[in-house]
From Swiss-Prot:
A cellular component annotation (GO) from this entry: carboxysome
MF terms (GO), sorted A to Z: structural constituent of carboxysome shell
Biotech exploitation of the protein: Heterologous expression of 12 carboxysomal genes in E.coli (ccaA, ccmK2, ccmK3, ccmK4, ccmL, ccmM, ccmN, ccmO, ccmP, rbcL, rbcS, rbcX) leads to the formation of bodies that resemble carboxysomes, have densely packed paracrystalline arrays and RuBisCO activity. These structures open the door to generating carboxysomes in plant cells to increase their photosynthesis and productivity, as well as tailoring bacterial microcompartments to specific metabolic needs and molecule delivery.
Subunit structure and binding partners: Homohexamer. Interacts with CcmO in the carboxysome. Interacts with CcmN.
Organism: Synechococcus elongatus (strain ATCC 33912 / PCC 7942 / FACHB-805) (Anacystis nidulans R2)
Protein name per UniProt: Carboxysome shell protein CcmK2
Description of its domains: The tight homohexamer forms a pore with an opening of about 5 Angstroms in diameter and is positively charged.
Location(s) in or outside the cell: Carboxysome
Family assignment from sequence similarity: Belongs to the bacterial microcompartments protein family. CcmK subfamily.
C-alpha cells in the first residue's frame, strides 16, 4: 500500500484543530502531529494510504475554511515520500501516535 503525507497550514490554531478533526474523521489516516511555525501559522500532518490522505486533506480544507478568523495558507500531499524524509522532517510515526495507526 503506497503511503502518503498530507499537510495543511493555517493561520490560527482553531482552524488547524478543526482541520485535524475533520481529517481523521473523513478517512483512515493517522494524525502524525502538528508544528507551530510562528506568527500564528500552524501545520497539521497526517499519513496513510494515498487515496485516504487525499480525501482527508480535502475534508480538512473544507472544515478549516469555515472557522471564523481562521485562514488556510497552504496544503500539500506527498505520495510515497522518500524514507529519508522521516529522519529530517516531523512526519515519522512516534510512540505517541503508534496506537492510532490504521
Amino acid at each position: 500500500m503506497p503511503i502518503a503525507v498530507g499537510m495543511i497550514e493555517t493561520l490560527g490554531f482553531p482552524a488547524v484543530v478543526e482541520a485535524a478533526d475533520a481529517m481523521v474523521k473523513a478517512a483512515r489516516v493517522t494524525l502524525v502531529g502538528y508544528e507551530k511555525i510562528g506568527s500564528g501559522r500552524v501545520t497539521v500532518i497526517v499519513r496513510g494510504d494515498v487515496s485516504e490522505v487525499q480525501a482527508s486533506v480535502s475534508a480538512g480544507l473544507d472544515s478549516a475554511k469555515r472557522v471564523a478568523g481562521g485562514e488556510v495558507l497552504s496544503h500539500h500531499i506527498i505520495a510515497r515520500p522518500h524514507e529519508n524524509l522521516e529522519y529530517v522532517l516531523p512526519i515519522r510515526y512516534t510512540e505517541a501516535v503508534e496506537q492510532f495507526r490504521m
